Amino acid sequence: MSPKKDAVSKPTPISVPVSRRSDIPGSLYVDTDMGFSGSPLPMPLDILQGNPIPPFLSKTFDLVDDPTLDPVISWGLTGASFVVWDPLEFARIILPRNFKHNNFSSFVRQLNTYGFRKIDTDKWEFANEAFLRGKKHLLKNIHRRRSPQSNQTCCSSTSQSQGSPTEVGGEIEKLRKERRALMEEMVELQQQSRGTARHVDTVNQRLKAAEQRQKQLLSFLAKLFQNRGFLERLKNFKGKEKGGALGLEKARKKFIKHHQQPQDSPTGGEVVKYEADDWERLLMYDEETENTKGLGGMTSSDPKGKNLMYPSEEEMSKPDYLMSFPSPEGLIKQEETTWSMGFDTTIPSFSNTDAWGNTMDYNDVSEFGFAAETTSDGLPDVCWEQFAAGITETGFNWPTGDDDDNTPMNDP
């Protein structure tokens, strides 16, 4: 061998750690310690330890800490609060860029949910115990407030989970009873509502019927007063009514004066209503009185024929007297003496409301249930019949002639 070859040194072999088998006999595990046991282990980041900082708080801290935004938002004098100097500019530029909205009121509400409070009434200055200048790591101590509803829900769920089965069963039974009572009340209210609806329908139908009758009455009155013949008859009837009322008042006064009793009588001077049993006695008394007056004061001239009711014996002996009939004047005199025969002093007054009060629209017969024939003047015959029947009941015999001097209104 040459000496040069012997002088070349061989490279030192690299020692590689070899895994050793476990010293435990029968163990299948292999010791994988590759010689790195002496190196330090990696530690987690500080941000991962504890509660994470909410993004809203971190963004707000960065905005307040940015010196370029001091004209809009900056720290307070002590560094324990921040001030929004220009809310309009803050809502127009900064909020859309960082919070994706431009509502300053929403930003303030968000601050309130994290416990910030407004410390100055003249400006928008907010403060929190953990929001301090240069101490961003304290933001993890700020927590979001929970709503009262969520707290109540949590408490109720906890109490329910802790309740015994007996209490839960009693609560369920109580809820069932309340539900049953509510259902019964609801059914009762529904029945009342239906009854009220039916009552309202009935009232509406009655109102419609009343309105229909009123319209029919108005239309009948309009047609009635357009009839000239009816208006003329009504005018004549009113004139006769005034005179008749005056005559009836005179007759009533005469009856009261004729039957007035002395003050010492048991009735005390009041007007006595005689019954039918006293008719004959009163009639005989009145005839004697009138005969005495007629015989004493009758003259040879009798223009109105008032002596026909009580003639003398000479006239009664004449044969022509039995064949004659008294004139209307005699009938009127007879009516005056009728008051002394015990009839009731109540005399019906025939005003236009009594004579014409029952007039109806005879064109609509089905509404009132009967029909009546009308005269050529358009006035129902039943009105004139009612008027004539009322006069007949009082005993008056009205003359049919055109001479108004024979009416009882002109009798002195």
From Swiss-Prot:
Residues 53-147 bind DNA. InterPro entries: HSF_DNA-bd, WH-like_DNA-bd_sf, WH_DNA-bd_sf. Residues 159-225 are annotated as: Hydrophobic repeat HR-A/B. It is found in: Nucleus. GO terms for cellular component: nucleus. GO terms for molecular function: DNA binding; DNA-binding transcription factor activity; sequence-specific DNA binding. Residues 148-166 have a biased composition (Low complexity). Pfam families: HSF_DNA-bind (PF00447). Keywords: Activator, Coiled coil, DNA-binding, Nucleus, Phosphoprotein, Repeat, Stress response, Transcription, Transcription regulation. A motif (AHA1) lies at residues 277-286. SMART domains: HSF. Residues 144-170 are annotated as: Disordered. Residues 166-224 form a coiled coil. One of its GO terms (biological process) is response to heat. Induction: By heat stress. Plants overexpressing HSFA3 show increased thermotolerance. Belongs to the HSF family. Class A subfamily. PANTHER family: HEAT SHOCK TRANSCRIPTION FACTOR (PTHR10015), HEAT STRESS TRANSCRIPTION FACTOR A-3 (PTHR10015:SF337). The hydrophobic-rich region (HR-A/B) corresponds to the oligomerization domain. AHA motifs are transcriptional activator elements. This is Heat stress transcription factor A-3. It comes from Arabidopsis thaliana (Mouse-ear cress).
